[in-house]
Amino acid sequence: MYDISKWKHVFKLDPNKELSDEHLEMICESGTDAVIVGGSDGITIDNVLHMLVSIRRYAVPCVLEVSDVEAITPGFDFYYIPSVLNSRKVEWVTGVHHEALKEFGDIMDWDEIYMEGYCVLNPEAKVAQLTDAKCDLTEDDVIAYARLADKLLHLPIFYLEYSGTYGDIELVKNVKAELKQAKLYYGGGISNAEQAKEMAQYADTVVVGNIIYDDIKSALKTVKAVKGE
């Protein structure tokens, strides 16, 4: 079984976006630690299954980040369940999760499931608008969410999500200093190897997403930049 605590670099693929077979092979054979399948809108069981079957041709670990209960399917190595801690809507903190447990709780393999405490920091991002996230946060606010995830809820992952814009490296550094057991994931705005390397100084896991669809060569260079191999 894979050890997610050792993952330094992951690619995130959106099932609602077009990706050629050639580029998918490049991603899966890049040396990244895992591929996460997830997105904010247009997620269906059909496009999730298509992505799963495509990725399963390769040896890379595969994770489904669940944003729609209707699109859950067996076959992934792990399932990440996001809880948007700074959402104004309880459904995105625990509501959807409660519904999922009502429907699937009896058949869940709990060894495959990890809860993510999300803090969304770009108000323009789809995920911020979907979840009505309160993004105008001070550093103290963000650190309080990190403590909530790490020390009160004992979540395995705290995820700083800048989605579409590059984040504040000092904030990432200070959040990392607060976490004792939760792993820090960083995602958002990484468009080159230099940015990926900078965030990897403090984030346990760097998530690279949108650049895959804009500049595949730059996306691939982030693997070596983060892992130093």
Swiss-Prot record:
Annotated metabolic or biological route of this protein: Membrane lipid metabolism; glycerophospholipid metabolism
Reaction it catalyzes: sn-glycerol 1-phosphate + all-trans-heptaprenyl diphosphate = 3-heptaprenyl-sn-glycero-1-phosphate + diphosphate
One Pfam family per UniProt: PcrB
EC id: 2.5.1.n9
Matching PANTHER family: HEPTAPRENYLGLYCERYL PHOSPHATE SYNTHASE, PTHR40029
Quaternary structure, from the entry: Homodimer.
Purpose: Prenyltransferase that catalyzes in vivo the transfer of the heptaprenyl moiety of heptaprenyl pyrophosphate (HepPP; 35 carbon atoms) to the C3 hydroxyl of sn-glycerol-1-phosphate (G1P), producing heptaprenylglyceryl phosphate (HepGP). This reaction is an ether-bond-formation step in the biosynthesis of archaea-type G1P-based membrane lipids found in Bacillales.
Protein known as: Heptaprenylglyceryl phosphate synthase
Naturally occurring in which organism (per UniProt): Bacillus mycoides (strain KBAB4) (Bacillus weihenstephanensis)
